[in-house]
Amino acid sequence: MSAGKVSIRDFLKKKGKEKITMLTAYDYPTAKIMSMTNLDGILVGDSLSMVVLGYENTLKVSMKEMLVHLDSVVRAKPRQLVVADMPFLSYEVSANTAVKNAGLFVRHGADSVKLEGGEEMADVVRKIVRAGIPVMGHIGLTPQRFLRIGGFRVLGKSKHEEEQLLRDAEVLEEAGIFSLVIENTYADVAKKITEKLKVPTICIGAGPYCDGQILVIHDVLGLSEFTPYFAKAYVNLKEEIQKAVNKYVEEVRESKFPQGENYKERES
């Protein structure tokens, strides 16, 4: 395991060299376990809206809820770079609101923030960066904007979409992002963006050519109700949890638990 706290500079140094690895985390125990691994970054993602809180999309999660989960992750003191997702309407209304909310995340222990959007978000990104807060960009399939782009689909098929994605990436880099998430685009498009930018790119569902990868922890652990085609379950914890719960129920009902080592009695 690598030693020391991962920094923005560490991310930048990995560009074109060693792949960056990121996962989401939303609570203390998960972040604590991750802190003992070689993982580079933790995203406290707005995906918690769906995988933790049970909402149907990412639009429902609030700043208050995001801050509660960020606090939980930060208390674990992970060595990884901690990135906080800015939820829907926490940065789109005005640049001043965006800076204020980004500042709240940093005050609560985030090392940086992530926000969705392309060139239309450049001024917002620029002002957050000028306030001294590192920003991770996010283009491609941006879940907070799924209504506008016509649902969840792979982007970059047409020449127009490809050119827009490239323009988004370049404008965001000029605005000061330190890295860029590319989600659910065609792999060759993500490759072109990666080759074009000086900052590292991190893919989710956009192929192997980026400078790094990020996945939702529930997908990796086999806990999701539905696993996206671009994800991979490295263990089936859902099945293991079911087995453990059923074993507990069985032992309690058959008076096999608790045993002597599980309780104390007064000596007569």
From Swiss-Prot:
InterPro entries: Pantoate_hydroxy_MeTrfase, Pyrv/PenolPyrv_kinase-like_dom, Pyrv_kinase-like_dom_sf. It catalyses: 3-methyl-2-oxobutanoate + (6R)-5,10-methylene-5,6,7,8-tetrahydrofolate + H2O = 2-dehydropantoate + (6S)-5,6,7,8-tetrahydrofolate. The keyword DNA damage does not apply. Transmembrane segments: none annotated. Mg(2+) binds at residues 46, 85, 116. 3-methyl-2-oxobutanoate binds at residues 46-47, 85, 114. GO terms for molecular function: 3-methyl-2-oxobutanoate hydroxymethyltransferase activity; magnesium ion binding. The active site is at 183 (proton acceptor). Catalyzes the reversible reaction in which hydroxymethyl group from 5,10-methylenetetrahydrofolate is transferred onto alpha-ketoisovalerate to form ketopantoate. Belongs to the PanB family. This is 3-methyl-2-oxobutanoate hydroxymethyltransferase.
